[in-house]
Swiss-Prot record:
The keyword Lipoprotein applies. It is found in: Cell membrane. This is Neuritin-B. It holds the Pfam family NRN1. One of its GO terms (biological process) is neuron projection extension. InterPro entries: Neuritin_fam (IPR026144). Its main location: membrane. It is a lipid-anchor; GPI-anchor. Transmembrane segments: none annotated. The lineage of its organism: Eukaryota, Metazoa, Chordata, Craniata, Vertebrata.
């Protein structure tokens, strides 16, 4: 019997954390639009995961998840494009730190991106929303 968290619960936690992060950024008065853009990226990723088709074969399953992950990264780069206050550097630092955590089954491992490195073909892990919450928490920690 493993821990089962519903998507709604996880995204509620994410929303609360994002609200806190956005409030902290607004108080600092820096790059408000960037954090709205990042939160929109996370919400879009969450919507895609919530509407994820569960009956796909394994390869198509992973390809679908990786396309969501790629879209998320494109969205974040776009959101960061207008901020001149080091947000891009913070995002790259956050991605490097997240990759270095070496969490088995993480999206960095499952979706190696354009490097051409072969990644394991596993079924969609249920921890994707938890990874999103973790990335949000890590971003908050880096910005403090």
């Amino acid at each position: 019997m493993g821990l089962k968290l519903s998507g709604r619960y996880i995204f509620l936690v994410l929303a609360v954390h994002l609200a806190y992060l956005l409030q902290a950024v607004k108080a600092a008065g820096k790059c408000d639009a960037v954090f709205k853009g990042l939160s929109d990226c996370m919400l879009t990723l969450g919507d895609k995961v919530a509407n994820y088709p569960q009956d796909l074969e394994e390869k198509k399953n992973l390809d679908t998840i990786c396309s969501y992950w790629d879209d998320f990264h494109v969205c974040t780069v776009t959101a960061l494009a207008d901020c001149q206050e080091g947000a891009s550097d913070i995002w790259e630092k956050l991605k490097r730190q997240s990759k270095n955590l070496n969490i088995q089954g993480s999206l960095f491992e499952l979706c190696p991106g354009s490097t051409g490195a072969p990644g394991p073909r596993l079924l969609f892990p249920a921890f994707l929303p938890l990874l999103i919450v973790f990335l949000s928490a890590l971003l908050n920690w880096v910005l403090q």
